[in-house]
Amino acid sequence: MGQIQYSEKYFDDTYEYRHVVLPPEVAKLLPKNRLLSENEWRAIGVQQSRGWVHYAIHRPEPHIMLFRRPLNFQQQQEAAAAAAAQMLPK
C-alpha cells in the first residue's frame, strides 16, 4: 500500500495551504463531487493538525486533496485556550 504524501505549507495574505497526495487505493475512496469534512478525511488516513479544511477539488488530479486554514490558526487557538484557562476559578 502506498503512503500518503504531504506538501510543505505555502501561504498568501489570508491562508496557509498544503496539498496531500493520496495513493491510488486511498484515492478511490474519495467521493467524486464533494469536499470531505475533517472527520471524513481523517477516516481515510490523512493526518494533520486541527483547523485544516478541504477547500477545493482539482478535477484533473482528484487524488490530490487541497487544504487551507487561516494564517496564525494555531496561535489563535492557543490564545483562546489560555484566556479560557484564566477564567476558571482557582
From Swiss-Prot:
Biological processes per GO annotation: cell division; regulation of mitotic cell cycle
Pfam family, one: CKS
Cross-referenced PROSITE patterns: CKS_1
Inducers of expression: By auxin.
One GO MF term: protein kinase binding
Record's keyword terms, sorted: Cell cycle, Cell division
Cellular component terms (Gene Ontology): cyclin-dependent protein kinase holoenzyme complex; SCF ubiquitin ligase complex
Highest taxon of the lineage: Eukaryota
Keyword Oxidoreductase: no
Cross-referenced InterPro entries: Cyclin-dep_kinase_reg-sub, Cyclin-dep_kinase_reg-sub_sf
Family, per entry: Belongs to the CKS family.
Its biological purpose: Binds to the catalytic subunit of the cyclin dependent kinases and is essential for their biological function.
Official protein name in the record: Cyclin-dependent kinases regulatory subunit 1
